[in-house]
Amino acid sequence: MSVKEWPVSERPREKLQTQGAEYLSDAELLAILLGSGSGGQDVVSFARRLLSDFGGVGALLTATPEQLLACNGIGPARVNQLRVVLELSRRYLKWQLERSDGFTEPTMVKDYLTSQLRHQGREVFAILLLDSQHRLLRYEELFQGTINAAPVYPREVIKLVMQYNAAAVILAHNHPSGVAEPSQADQRVTERVKKALTLIDVALLDHFVVGAGDPISFAERGLL
C-alpha cells in the first residue's frame, strides 16, 4: 500500500505540517526527502531499510557515493540529494561555531568534526583556528596521508595560525579504521604542536580523534 493510501494523520508530509519536524522519526524525515519508494516498497519502508542497512542517519549521510550506489533504489540523483543534506548540515554547524563560544559547547565541535572527517577514506589532520573569544575563524585540512599515518609539521600549523591571527587552536584527525583511541604517535604529535604554539603564546585547547563512535577528546582524557 502506498503512503497516499495511509490515513492522513500517519503520512509523513501531513505529520510534518501538523506536528512539526521534531515529531517525525528518522525514517519519516528521510522518506520526505526521497519522495518515493523502490522495488515495491513504500517510501517509508524504503527509508527504514536504508537506515537499517547503513546503521543510522549519520552513517547514511557520510557514506561514499560508491557505497550509496551499491544499494537498490539509489541512483545518482538520490546520491546528490543526500550529499546536499550533509553539506548543508556542515555549513549550519560551521555557522553555529562562528557565532558562538564554540569551545564551551564541545558537543557542537564534535558534531562538526565528525561531519568533516568521519567519511574520509584516509587519515586527515585538520585544525580549527579560533579568535580570542574561542569563536571559529577557519577550519583547514592541513595534511592527508595514507590510511596508517598523516605527516604533521608544526611549522605548517604555526604558519596558518599567524596567517589568520588565531588566539587558540583545536586539532583534529580521523582514524579511518574506525577506532578512535589515541595512539602514542598521536600523543607525540600533539605535544610537538603544543610546544610550538607555546612559543608564540597561542593556546592548544584540544585535540579530537574522529572514528566510528563519539570523537575522543585529549582534554577530557587529561592528555594535554
From Swiss-Prot:
A motif (JAMM motif) lies at residues 173-186. InterPro entries: MPN, RadC_JAB, RuvA_2-like, UPF0758, UPF0758_CS, UPF0758_N. It comes from the Bacteria. The keyword Cell membrane does not apply. The keyword Hydrolase applies. Residues 102-224 form the MPN domain. Pfam families: RadC, UPF0758_N. Belongs to the UPF0758 family. This is UPF0758 protein IL0240.
